[in-house]
Design a protein with these regions (language model features):
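Alpha/beta-hydrolase active-site loop
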Residues: 155-176
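Hydrolase active-site cap/lid region
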Residues: 196-243
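Short alpha-helix in the alpha/beta-hydrolase fold that links the catalytic acid
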Residues: 263, 277-287
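N-terminal targeting or regulatory segments adjacent to alpha/beta-hydrolase or S9 domains
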Residues: 1-70
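C-terminal catalytic histidine-bearing segment of alpha/beta-hydrolase fold enzymes
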Residues: 293-333
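Short substrate-entry loop that stabilizes the transition state in hydrolases
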Residues: 96-101, 107-148, 218
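N-terminal cap/lid segment of alpha/beta-hydrolase-fold proteins
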Residues: 53-98
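Short beta-strand/loop motif that positions the catalytic acidic residue
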Residues: 261, 267-269, 273
Length: 333
């Protein structure tokens, strides 16, 4: 009996030792799914913005700042992703809840923050559009006018221009004198880049007029202009190196999603433009034509080149804006 008890005890001890070593030295297997951690700027990839539903907010018209016989200009504000964004809106005087007007959403080009004044880059064209029966609305963007501060991250600040634009378009229906089913987009320079990206994300037949648009791939589209920086872009390139280490830049580049632009497009380019090379617009038009050549009902594509015209389309400005009035009237009336 004692012998049986001893054997039983030895078996128990042996099992305990075996269990100890098996559990202590067994390789630790980590599920690859557990390492798929979303990074902060992943939400701004064009593909992810396509999936997002933009709900919008109330556009609040603040005090009227100017009134003419044809329209009234207001400062406005709305909320974009929890941040206040201000801007300018021009409303034809005959607009009402029973006579709703089409709207042109305008995106300006780059302006130095310290030199910016509300309406800069859009005010002159918006007044002409309003004179011709269109409501126009242009955001200052975060960090400008009376808007809240943008992200401290230079790349997120850029991506916030897209979400601001998309939230603004989603908010159009809150204006009682505007017909939200008749929306056009206008963009100049970097605002053209915003307009193109918005058109890709929305993937709707929205008419867009683009003046000398920045249309190259990201991040080349920003590196191109760094020779104007005090440090010639050294700090930005350093941040970009880190960004490229963490993210796939191709997922943020509008050039990879041009086939999603569904609406009619009208592009204007000055042959004497020293800010945006004419060849950029030449290449954009070629890509758009190639993407649309097999479409059964391809949307209209107009491309106008102006000899001697600069980045602001001077001295052809009057002709350019008159062509845009005809263009928007065709699709929004």
């Amino acid at each position: 009996m004692r012998r049986v008890f001893l054997i039983f005890t030895l078996i128990i001890v042996a099992c305990g030792i075996a269990f100890f070593f098996l559990t202590k030295y067994q390789p630790h297997i980590v599920s690859p799914l557990g390492q798929l951690i979303e990074k902060p700027l992943d939400k701004y990839t064009i593909a992810n913005l396509m999936k997002r539903q933009f709900i919008g907010s109330q556009i609040v018209l603040d005090d009227a700042v100017a009134t003419t016989s044809a329209f009234t200009s207001y400062r406005f504000h709305f909320t974009s992703d929890g941040k206040k964004v201000t801007g300018f809106v021009h409303v034809p005087n005959d607009a009402s809840e029973k006579n709703k007007k089409p709207v042109i959403v305008q995106f300006r080009g780059y302006v130095d923050r310290e030199k910016y004044t509300p309406g800069e880059g859009t005010k002159r064209s918006s007044e002409v559009f309003a004179n011709n029966g269109f409501v126009t609305i242009a955001p200052d963007f975060l960090g400008y006018g009376g808007s809240a501060s943008p992200s401290a991250d230079v790349f997120e600040e850029r991506f916030e221009t897209y979400t601001t634009a998309l939230n603004l378009i989603a908010s159009i229906g809150s204006l009682s004198r505007v017909d939200p089913s008749r929306v056009g987009i206008w963009g100049h320079s970097n605002g053209g880049q915003i307009a193109l990206t918005v058109a890709e994300i929305l993937n709707k037949p929205i008419p867009a007029a683009l003046w000398a648009p920045v249309s190259k791939s990201f991040p080349y589209s920003i590196l191109y202009f760094t020779d104007e920086f005090d440090d010639h872009g050294k700090a930005l390139r350093k941040r970009l190196a880190k960004f490229e280490n963490d993210y796939d830049v191709e997922r943020y580049s509008l050039t990879n999603y041009v086939d999603r632009i569904m609406g009619p497009i009208q592009i204007h380019e000055g042959m004497a433009d020293e800010a945006v090379p004419q060849k950029w617009s030449d290449e954009l038009v070629k890509v758009l034509k190639d993407k649309r050549k097999d479409a059964t009902n391809a949307a209209e594509l107009n491309y106008f080149i102006y000899p001697g015209a600069d980045h602001n389309l001077m001295p052809a400005w009057n002709l350019v804006v008159s062509r845009d009035i005809q263009f928007f009237s065709k699709y929004l009336r």
